[in-house]
Amino acid sequence: MPTSQPWLKIYDELGIKSPGTVSRTMASFLEDHAKNSSDADALHYCGKSFSYAIYNGEANKLANALRDEGVRKGDVVGLHMPNIPQYVLALAAISKLGAIGTGISPILAPGEVLAQIKDANVKVVLSFSELTPVTVAIKDIPTGLKAVIICGPRDYLDAPQVELPEYIGPASIRFTDLMDGQSDQFQSEPVDPESIFMIQYTGGTTGPPKGAMLSHRSLVTNAFQASATHEALLERPIVLGSAFPLFHVAGLTNAITTCIYKGLYHLIPDPRNVSHYCEMMKLVPPTHIVAVPALYEMWMANPAFKEIDFSQLKVAHTGAAPVTQSTLNALNTIIGENKIADGFGMTEAGPTHVVHPNMRYKKGSVGLPVAGADLRIVDIETGLKTMPVGEPGEIITSGPHLMSGYLGRPKATVEALRELDGKIWMYTGDVGYVDEEGYLFLCDRAKDMLIVGGYKVFSVEVEDKLCAMPAIASCAIIGTPDEKRPGNDVVNLYVELAQNFKNDPDAKNRIVAFCRENMAAYKIPKAIHLIDEIPLTAVGKIDKKALRKAV
């Protein structure tokens, strides 16, 4: 790929300009909106709306409360909750204090929660009431953890509308008690935009989770980059129905972007509760929706999804996992044509570094680099040689959206962030290629690319073809070392059969026949495993780490 950035020609045609580096904090935007558009709706949760004035006032109360608990600039606050109001209030409060947040997945086991609390040196944790036994149980272990604040799903509801049990235990502080009597005024601390705002842990699907340190500058700049590239993100009004959990970097950036552009953010505690999601979208129809392919498929399987008013929908974003053509076709029939936008990102890149410009979609591609970012394809072996157009290699990205490094892992930081031609590049570990216009096409994770007889087998390509079979609900390709041919892999296929084919005794033979007809011999799986369910991560990605353990 030439280093001339061919996508800039398209950006010139569309009038897309780089936002440069935006040196502001999330809290500064919230405070502006609370002052200038105080009555505008900011949050929607289980039928209740919060104006920007209330959003800012409650965040001020929480900032005062956290300061009373000893939280100071640079201290780490753990956010161990689903998508409830306290999470976004905490983000704003942390930004005001100059503290650091870290999202802790609600589905982690106690030992995993403890490991993250220790690794990030968490001082105070806000924990969901249903999860509080986990954090209370580890509070007495010497980790530096000083307080556990219990956040209930009903703290901001006049009447319970979502059945989520609460738990109040010893050695903890109730959120409502903490907030009682606090002032809704707060003088935000002077915060260096280069300082760390969030420590976001990688999913750990290919190894132990690492804490990516993201500055105020990187997260805010990335929100501007993505919005500048896809103009639909800037169109008012903005009503975002995001299915990403806030502890995930995509959910985090959705919340930050919506706040920056004075939009309304739907807080959905459990996006897998399709009935509740659809009910909320009917109450306040979305202009933007964001989800992984697996969730779109779950939603479309429920008749209620088809009853949502999508007439104002501008864009349906998808990412974090490959999306099949059959899913795209089905979604188009429900939401309307030319609204789906694929993209590509990762925690370490703030997270978005490739999106489709508005109305310039290219089939099979995930888009172009966001405005102000650079992208190259380099050889996997050395990471130094730029690959020609159309030839796959490792995807690397550069720009002001990149992380500052991995917390406490200098070796991993040096391996990921490398200097090349006078720039710092993030080596993503993903394999792809670009065409002559600079559009990026994904092939696979470098770790998921198999070698069979000297040929490269991209698991995503094989999985996508197999998902066209009516008998297959979901599948995953896993490579294992070929003992007979060192340096080669055996292609293993894990299959979750569709409901109507669960008892088909001829399922494996049908799959083999399909493969022989639709792909080269070296790509055909040598071992087929029929399992009850393909494991998924918290955000709906196929959990290949779990499958590898089962091999």
What spans do the regions from the language model cover?
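Flexible, low-complexity linker/hinge segments
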Residues: 15-24, 156, 161-196
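Conserved AMP-binding/adenylate-forming core of the ANL superfamily
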Residues: 21-22, 39-84, 88-92, 109-114
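Structural core segment of the AMP-binding/adenylate-forming
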Residues: 68-69, 96-177, 499
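Conserved adenylate-forming
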Residues: 69-71, 183-195, 199-242, 262
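AMP-binding/adenylate-forming catalytic core of the ANL superfamily
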Residues: 108, 115, 125-130, 399, ...
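Conserved AMP-binding/adenylation subdomain of ANL enzymes
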Residues: 220-239, 247-288, 302
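Gly/Ser/Thr-rich phosphate-binding loop
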Residues: 286-291, 300-362, 374, 384
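Conserved ATP/PPi-binding loop(s) of AMP-dependent carboxylate-activating enzymes
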Residues: 368-372, 383-417, 455-457
